[in-house]
Amino acid sequence: MALSPVAIDLDGALGDTRPLWVDFLVDAERRYASIAPLDPSALPKDRGAAAEELDRWAERGVGDWRGALERFAEDRAPVHFRPSADAATALRALAATGRRLGVYTDAPAELAAVALAHLGAGRRVELVEAGAGARERLLAELGPDTAVAASREDLVRISESGREKP
């Protein structure tokens, strides 16, 4: 019998991208102030919804904010992301079993990709869903038997048990 797939919360189980997101918004507010004012505190807390607002903001002359986010994240990843030995061991163990592994986050895809690469998790996961509704999209793709690792503790427990209650 095949083991159930695992959906992993990037921010809860692998590395929290929110502080880097906040730093980017503060930088963007300052950097693009003369082009298009930005008030980070007025953005929705859900980063998928915030990204949609930033897309509209960028149309006022800012340009490719997503590319700017990716460059910003690449420059600052070593400060913000510290690979966890527990998480790395758990991912290795899960990947060795042949389970389908997916990661979800409400962060924009550009930030998620940088975080996964820096945390050493990118090559171990099959699917990555980012932005608004990412968790739901990933669970739909992986199927109803998917175990969810919302925290690092969940990830370790699932890897040690070989199975988890959905």
Q: Which residue stretches match the model-derived regions?
A:
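Asp-based, Mg2+/Mn2+-dependent phosphohydrolase catalytic module
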Residues: 1-2, 95, 109, 113-166
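Short glycine/serine/threonine/alanine-rich loop segments
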Residues: 34, 99, 144
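Short, acidic loop-to-helix structural element flanking the phosphoryl-transfer center
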Residues: 75-103, 113
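N-terminal helical cap/lid subdomain that shapes the substrate entry/recognition surface
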Residues: 2-85
